[in-house]
UniProtKB/Swiss-Prot annotation:
One of its GO terms (molecular function) is ferrous iron binding. CDD domains: Frataxin (cd00503). This is Iron-sulfur cluster assembly protein CyaY. Transmembrane segments: none annotated. One of its GO terms (cellular component) is cytosol. SUPFAM superfamilies: Frataxin/Nqo15-like. GO terms for biological process: iron-sulfur cluster assembly. SMART domains: Frataxin_Cyay. It comes from Shigella flexneri. The keyword Hydrolase does not apply.
Length: 106
């Protein structure tokens, strides 16, 4: 994968997250902001999830209250380089815990 393809795929990931949060019907207030290639999800309780791209490594990094995760693209899925879990699984787990209600991105 070259740098431009990586940025296209990361942009697509950011857009999907933003659209899913805009479309959700949950009770808690969840805000999403993109600034300089960093996506920040802020929850009603003040906690945050930070998602950024690491261009030199062609990775997406996810920082949550539970820890930090690094994802490589394998096929059409972003996969954690330590646990083998998908980006969507870990994001949903963290968002659900931090929101105090089920948050789905799929």
């Amino acid at each position: 994968m070259n740098d431009s393809e990586f940025h296209r795929l990361a942009d697509q990931l950011w857009l999907t997250i933003e659209e899913r949060l805009d479309d959700r019907d949950g009770d808690s207030d969840i805000d999403c902001e993109i600034n300089g290639g960093v996506l920040t999800i802020t929850f009603e309780n003040g906690s945050k999830i930070i998602i950024n791209r690491q261009e030199p490594l062609h990775q997406v990094w996810l920082a949550t209250k539970q820890g930090g995760y690094h994802f490589d693209l394998k096929g059409d899925e972003w996969i954690c380089d330590r646990s083998g879990e998908t980006f969507w699984d870990l994001l949903e787990q963290a968002a659900t815990q931090q929101a105090g209600e089920t948050v789905s991105f799929r």
